[in-house]
A protein has these predicted regions:
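Short acidic DE-rich linear segments
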Residues: 102-105
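Compositionally biased, intrinsically disordered low-complexity regions
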Residues: 7-10, 82, 95
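Acidic, low-complexity, intrinsically disordered interaction modules
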Residues: 15-19, 23-91
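N-terminal trafficking/processing presequences and adjacent post-cleavage segments
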Residues: 1-11, 15
């Protein structure tokens, strides 16, 4: 799973905010406009084995990974900020477990 810098080639690129397959999936599951500005993203610093899942307004979940950057756990809080997730959103995200996190171009 590639992390793509949310602000690539701009003065904001060092903010460490990234899109990925999980954030795209969450946008779809929540019914967000794919061309809108209000989208899910992850904050990446690779310090503690966890990437926070964010949306403007708050942190609503996490992607946990091991020392090889393999995803081991994903969880999204369904009663905070975004109220439009399907009931099984966390189950649907489990398909990403086992994927390797890589930095994109």
């Amino acid at each position: 799973m590639k992390l793509i810098n949310k602000y690539a080639n701009s003065r904001y690129s060092k903010m460490n905010e990234y899109y990925c397959g999980i954030t795209t999936e969450l946008d779809k599951l929540a019914g967000l406009d794919p061309n809108g500005h209000w989208k899910h993203y992850v904050f990446c610093d690779y310090e503690d084995g966890c990437l926070p899942i964010r949306i403007p307004g708050g942190t609503l979940g996490s992607i946990e990974y091991d020392e090889n950057k393999i995803i081991t756990k994903i969880h999204v809080c369904t009663d905070y900020v975004v109220k439009t997730y399907p009931d099984d959103v966390n189950e649907q995200l489990q398909k990403f477990i086992g994927q390797k996190i890589e930095m994109g171009d």
